[in-house]
Amino acid sequence: MSESQSSGRSAEALALQHLSDSGLRLLERNWSCRSGELDLVMLDGDTVVFVEVRYRRHTAWGGALESVDVRKQQKLIKAAQLFLQAHGRWAKHPCRFDVVAITAPGQAKDLNWIRNAFES
């Protein structure tokens, strides 16, 4: 595993812990499909939450939050649609897209959780 992949996995673990501590329940982690991957799929009450976790060591080319551009949002929306098709149990539940942006050194204080980060 590369250093970048290791940092990404650590960021996902930090995000998962933070969201779980905030009352969300994990449904899936790293769910893959032809449109890409959903980092975390969680349940907040009865709302299915698709969480994109972004980690940036530095902001020279933009921060973690800015890296979730329109193209990335479209891929996440398509992946979420495929998830809901594959898991019909959740298809009638309300959904939202959250982003957890983490900047180095990757401590809880460096975590920014944006609920409803974008609309589908």
UniProtKB/Swiss-Prot annotation:
For this protein, the record's Pfam families field holds: UPF0102
* InterPro entries per record: Restrct_endonuc-II-like, tRNA_endonuc-like_dom_sf, UPF0102_YraN-like
Q: Name one GO molecular function term.
A: nucleic acid binding
> From which domain of life does this come?
Bacteria
Q: List the disulfide bonds.
A: none
Query: SUPFAM superfamilies, from UniProt?
Result: Restriction endonuclease-like (SSF52980)
The text of the family note is: Belongs to the UPF0102 family.
Q: What is this protein called?
A: UPF0102 protein PST_1070
